[in-house]
Amino acid sequence: MRPSGRTAQQVRPITLTRNFTAHAEGSVLVEFGNTKVICTASVEENVPRWLKGKGKGWVTAEYGMLPRATHTRNRREAASGKQGGRTMEIQRLIARSLRAAVDLEALGEQMITVDCDVIQADGGTRTASITGASVALADAINHMIATGKLKSNPMKGHVAAVSVGIYNGEAICDLEYVEDSAADTDMNVVMMEDGKMIEVQGTAEEAPFSHQELLDMLALAQQGINDIIEKQKAALAE
């Protein structure tokens, strides 16, 4: 039995609140249970120097956590003058995931930056960030179409992510903190809505996992992501 009473394949209650802030072209408050992340997508009519004149756009991301998003206060990274390794790893993952969902040539020489700011953490902050960022990105692109900055939609489809793991000898989906901290194995999976995988990150924290357990976790991830993408579509249809 999971601490929350959820079944092995059951994701937490997920809410995607669009237009959460006033100024960004796309903004979403994404909630995976008690994990809450604000995702804002900002459009700039330029690209990085190394892309200038190549007729392609760019999608990038930044990630951060409020000092008291966790049980005890964490010092702001800005106070130390540099980002931590975990932060850089996560924001690169978010950016790679979003770029996989966009035709960069169709975007033209424009850049979209998605900022993911965790305001409350209870496990799965990176997967929640990717899920919310995809919706914020879709809204930003729709804004670009409405304002004449794009003629057609460069998004190839929705992208979402979920964590899976081995907890008490059982494969489970969408780990909250109490499960994540005690899991034998922790894995993050990012997928497109057509079922193609963008990224699989897995680590045996306490005990190695078998090939069958890997397959079980991937199957749970696909089922969970299918459920999450339906929630993305429903949010964007509102």
From Swiss-Prot:
| Coiled-coil residue spans | none
Looking up CDD domains in the UniProt record yields:
RNase_PH_bact
Reaction(s) catalysed by this chain, per the record, are: tRNA(n+1) + phosphate = tRNA(n) + a ribonucleoside 5'-diphosphate
One of its Pfam families is RNase_PH_C
Q: Which InterPro entries match?
A: ExoRNase_PH_dom1 (IPR001247), ExoRNase_PH_dom2 (IPR015847), ExoRNase_PH_dom2_sf (IPR036345), PNPase/RNase_PH_dom_sf (IPR027408), Ribosomal_Su5_D2-typ_SF (IPR020568), RNase_PH (IPR050080), RNase_PH_bac-type (IPR002381), RNase_PH_CS (IPR018336)
Gene Ontology MF terms = 3'-5'-RNA exonuclease activity; tRNA binding; tRNA nucleotidyltransferase activity
Give the record's keywords alphabetically: Nucleotidyltransferase, RNA-binding, rRNA processing, Transferase, tRNA processing, tRNA-binding
Output the SUPFAM superfamilies linked to this UniProt entry: Ribonuclease PH domain 2-like, Ribosomal protein S5 domain 2-like
Q: What is its EC number?
A: 2.7.7.56
One GO term under biological process is: rRNA processing
Question: What general EC class does the enzyme of this chain belong to?
Answer: transferase
> Where does the chain bind phosphate?
R86, G124, T125, R126
Q: Which family is annotated?
A: Belongs to the RNase PH family.
What's its job?
Phosphorolytic 3'-5' exoribonuclease that plays an important role in tRNA 3'-end maturation. Removes nucleotide residues following the 3'-CCA terminus of tRNAs; can also add nucleotides to the ends of RNA molecules by using nucleoside diphosphates as substrates, but this may not be physiologically important. Probably plays a role in initiation of 16S rRNA degradation (leading to ribosome degradation) during starvation.
The family database entries (NCBIfam families) matched by this protein are listed as: RNasePH
Q: Relate the assembly described in the record.
A: Homohexameric ring arranged as a trimer of dimers.
Do you know which PANTHER family this protein is assigned to? EXOSOME COMPLEX COMPONENT, EXOSOME COMPLEX COMPONENT RRP41
What HAMAP family does this protein map onto?
RNase_PH
Recorded protein name is Ribonuclease PH
Q: Which organism is it from?
A: Aliivibrio fischeri (strain ATCC 700601 / ES114) (Vibrio fischeri)
Gene that encodes the chain: rph
